[in-house]
């Protein structure tokens, strides 16, 4: 399955009638990392198109018929940096074949390594940060004129990226940033360094963008922030996020609202109530645990403990019994003992997460945890495999509970490997579970953005299959 970042890597739809114009140049955006990076790549594409560039078609990309490649980088994990330099190295050969090709590097690694990137990869033409996406066209022009790399990375946020033009990867499902940056000081995390302190957008601006998305065809929005539920704290309104969720419920045509990611320390009862009482806010939650050990949580500077975390989950499930909750867990944080790890396994077993993004701890230079005593790799690997096995079992057991139930799926495409051959469409049901829906014989294929209600006939390891047989009393219905 593709990651959100891979789906965001920008390719244009092929022209229907004639050869597409090259404009100022044909570009491709290669995205690494989180949902915020995915959204930033939409801004990068929008800025370039506003300056006269044209997104590459798949054929142009495969034939290397490209004038500009932009890499939007991630800095959260060590292998992200390795992937960045490895990929840029491959592009050096492409540039030797096409001397006029320009290469730009942006995102979190650019914010961190700015000068190092230009020195280590002198074939790069422009380096820009997370706070000055809008300057990319000017940097490319200067590099073309001056014949050497242009490096411009700002430390201060002068404007919200949301003010920039946007070329959204999906016309029916949109990302909407409500804040940028983070005020927490987790000892393992580099994000406050790359994204800066938290800055919130005005609620009116957020709602105006959501309405614009709906007017342009979006049926679903995901509210983005490093810590969405601390939205409004800077102006002393700790209820601002729950108010925003309720305001989303008043927008005509907006079918589904999701958000990511909240911080457990700031997850309050008013947010739970808003989720439960606002019909178009989905009962899906990504809720990062990081560790089940209170000792490790303290070392991480995570300002909650496992008992509080589990108590919040209890309240969520009391208010929304159908809620699907995913999480992040770090294995092998410095100083983690077997006893600490057993606490994590205990919490995971009790929490019954729908899914978990599990990571082996990766030291990031400049973070306090990188200076702590590290756990031997073989020990960490063993723990990681045990955690994955536990979560895989829980995920399968959870998905089995969907068998025989009717789910409403918003069609996003035919992204499953076998969808075309099996006459299926793909999308997510209300709580975020991926579903492949079989279209009964004689029925027209639903289109992207349609809502299909179907009976789940089989639970896979990570998704659901709905191959309903209406003659046997199973449900299949399409809503446009």
Curated annotation (Swiss-Prot):
Q: What does the UniProt keyword field contain?
A: 4Fe-4S, Cytoplasm, Iron, Iron-sulfur, Metal-binding, S-adenosyl-L-methionine, Transferase, tRNA processing
Q: Domain MTTase N-terminal: where?
A: 25-145
Mostly located where?
A: cytoplasm
Give the superkingdom in one word: Bacteria
Instruction: Please tell me where [4Fe-4S] cluster 1 binds in this chain.
Output: 34, 74, 108
**How does the cofactor attach, per the note?**
Binds 2 [4Fe-4S] clusters. One cluster is coordinated with 3 cysteines and an exchangeable S-adenosyl-L-methionine.
Give compartment(s): Cytoplasm
- Radical SAM core domain location, by residue? 168-397
Q: What class of enzyme is it?
A: transferase
The enzyme's E.C. designation? 2.8.4.3
CDD domains attached to this UniProt entry: Radical_SAM (cd01335)
UniProt xrefs under PROSITE patterns: MTTASE_N, MTTASE_RADICAL, RADICAL_SAM, TRAM
Instruction: Outline the extent of the TRAM domain.
Output: 400-470
| Alphabetical list of InterPro entries matching this protein | Elp3/MiaA/NifB-like_rSAM (IPR006638), Methylthiotransferase (IPR005839), Methylthiotransferase_CS (IPR020612), Methylthiotransferase_N (IPR013848), Methylthiotransferase_N_sf (IPR038135), MiaB_methiolase (IPR006463), rSAM (IPR007197), rSAM_horseshoe (IPR023404)
Q: Which GO terms describe its cellular component?
A: cytosol
One MF term in GO for this entry? 4 iron, 4 sulfur cluster binding
What does the subunit section of this Swiss-Prot or TrEMBL entry state? Monomer.
Instruction: Please name the HAMAP family in this protein's record.
Output: tRNA_metthiotr_MiaB
- Family the entry assigns: Belongs to the methylthiotransferase family. MiaB subfamily.
What functional role does this protein have? Catalyzes the methylthiolation of N6-(dimethylallyl)adenosine (i(6)A), leading to the formation of 2-methylthio-N6-(dimethylallyl)adenosine (ms(2)i(6)A) at position 37 in tRNAs that read codons beginning with uridine.
Put simply, this protein is called: tRNA-2-methylthio-N(6)-dimethylallyladenosine synthase
Q: What is this organism's lineage?
A: Bacteria, Bacillati, Actinomycetota, Actinomycetes, Bifidobacteriales
